A protein has these predicted regions:
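Beta/alpha (TIM)-barrel catalytic core signal, keyed to glycine-rich beta->alpha loops juxtaposed to Asp/Glu
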Residues: 107-280
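Acidic-and-aromatic substrate-binding clefts and catalytic sites of carbohydrate-active enzymes
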Residues: 22-25, 45-53, 77-82, 108-113, ...
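Residues at the N-termini of beta-strands
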Residues: 41, 99-102, 130, 154
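Acidic (Asp/Glu)-rich catalytic clusters
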Residues: 7, 55-65, 89-96, 121-123, ...
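Short, acidic/polar
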Residues: 22-34, 79-95, 114, 139-142, ...
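N-terminal binding-site loop/beta-alpha segment at the start of enzyme catalytic domains
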Residues: 1-68, 185, 278-280
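Glycine/small-residue-rich loop that forms an oxyanion/phosphate-binding "nest" at active or ligand-binding sites
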Residues: 73-121
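Alpha-helical scaffolding within the catalytic cores
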Residues: 1-4, 52-59, 88-90, 138-141, ...
Length: 280
């Protein structure tokens, strides 16, 4: 597994397993399957309501905790210094661990400055190894990075071949913040898996469109957390380190970028309203 070095020196796997929308009742089994495939980085969140399943699977694996890299996120309903501080303790308990490897502000809403202060404090206390943000567009990212003491190590954003975040990735180099992709397969939108460019390139390497798409992001040093509840798909997603895309391949895939979200805008009032109500 290839690692990437964060801005505080912490080594983070480039590829992990995401549990967004994994049923809490199924999560332990799914994470156990992912661990057996070889995944050691697991991405969860307070709002996913499956942190317990992640913690159970890691505990039961019998593998040393130090071998794992656990990511979780502080939800909007826990925004603010006091609430975020309490929620971090809850996450530690649910995950059955003394520390979280990477803790993110999940959404740029509510008192996320207060949340971030609580995260900085947890970092200094050794309860968190690295901190960052999620879904922070360039303006909100820059504002937070400029004013905070500990610069975000990671910004997790919608990132896939149709929305490549080239400009944001370049901008974040100012504070050495790494880009982390959610939705690396765009949840199949735009006929993702039937894309002619991805499939034509895949034929050269005997790889699927999904594997080519993942490899493209990984070669750009973008951290990826593909999700599947099927073990065979977990294995396919994991088998992306035995081939290298050429410069021509990379250029071809770059032309697929629409620079537009395929999901939602964090500046859409209706979406913001929904996020603010969700999980309250």
């Amino acid at each position: 597994m290839k690692n990437i070095q964060l801005n505080n020196g912490v080594q983070m796997p480039l590829l992990g397993y995401g549990v967004y929308q994994v049923d809490p009742k199924e999560c332990e089994r799914c994470v156990s399957d992912a661990i057996s495939v070889g995944y050691r980085m697991i991405d969860t969140a307070q709002i996913y309501r499956n942190e317990e399943g992640v913690g159970n699977a890691i505990k039961k694996s019998g593998i040393d905790r130090k071998e794992f890299f656990i990511v979780t996120k502080v939800w909007v309903s826990n925004a603010g210094y006091e609430k975020a501080k309490a929620s971090i303790e809850t996450s530690l308990r649910k995950l059955q661990t003394d520390y979280i490897d990477l803790l993110l502000v999940h959404q740029p809403f509510g008192d996320y400055y207060g949340s971030y202060r609580a995260m900085e404090e947890a970092y200094k206390e050794g309860k968190v190894r690295a901190i960052g943000v999620s879904n922070f567009y360039a303006d909100r990212y820059l504002d937070l990075a400029y004013h905070c003491e500990i610069k975000p190590a990671v910004n997790q954003m919608e990132t896939h071949v149709f929305y490549q975040q080239q400009d944001l990735q370049e901008l974040m180099k100012k504070y050495d913040t790494k880009l982390m992709s959610w939705g690396p397969f765009a949840e199949g939108k735009n006929d993702f898996f039937a894309n002619p460019t991805l499939n034509a390139i895949g034929e050269k390497y005997h790889k699927s469109a999904a594997q080519v798409a993942l490899r493209y992001l990984l070669q750009r040093d973008i951290i990826c957390i593909p999700k599947s509840v099927r073990k065979e798909r977990m294995q396919q997603n994991f088998n992306v380190f035995d081939f290298q895309l050429s410069a021509e391949d990379m250029s071809q895939i770059a032309t697929l970028d629409t620079q537009q979200t395929l999901f939602f805008s964090h500046r859409d009032p209706a979406f913001v309203e929904m996020i603010l109500q969700y999980g309250r």
